[in-house]
Amino acid sequence: MRSFEFFEHTADVGIRAYGKSLEEAFSNAALGVFEIITDTSKVKPIEYREIYLNGYDLENLLYKWIEELLYYYDSELMVFSKFDLMIDQDSMTLEGKAWGEKFNGKIHERRTVVKAMTYHQLSIEKTENCYVITFVVDI
């Protein structure tokens, strides 16, 4: 199973992420976002940021997850390539770590800046054998 794919969207970028678990799908969604920014295969997981979030539904939790990661990129130039997280659907909370390093133009390719997460086309579906997350980011 592929982890994510991009789809065309006027002036923005659509991402479809997959995972056997909800946590894996959220991780792959984040990886897709950072793949827009740089080549994540060159991002070493040497630092982490702890993340604690709550939402009112899964879509809101995903929105906050991506926005929180983009906050670290905007404020600290952190790029991420590895994610360890737990989602509690009863309390609608996400707890985890995002692993990566500070962007370095000598090591990391500068691609496209992701400005923000959006609710446009945002959906989280559970199929027979995986979760599928679809969303659009503003570039």
Swiss-Prot record:
Do you know which Pfam families this protein is assigned to?
Answer: Archease
- TM region positions: none
- Assigned keywords, A-Z: Calcium, Metal-binding, tRNA processing
- GO molecular function list: calcium ion binding
Can the keyword tRNA processing be found in this entry's annotation?
A: yes
Report residues binding Ca(2+): 12, 138-139
Q: Which InterPro entries match?
A: Archease, Archease_arc, Archease_dom, Archease_dom_sf
Annotated GO biological processes are: tRNA splicing, via endonucleolytic cleavage and ligation
Q: Which family does it belong to?
A: Belongs to the archease family.
Q: What does this protein do?
A: Activates the tRNA-splicing ligase complex by facilitating the enzymatic turnover of catalytic subunit RtcB. Acts by promoting the guanylylation of RtcB, a key intermediate step in tRNA ligation. Can also alter the NTP specificity of RtcB such that ATP, dGTP or ITP is used efficiently.
- Protein name, UniProt field: Protein archease
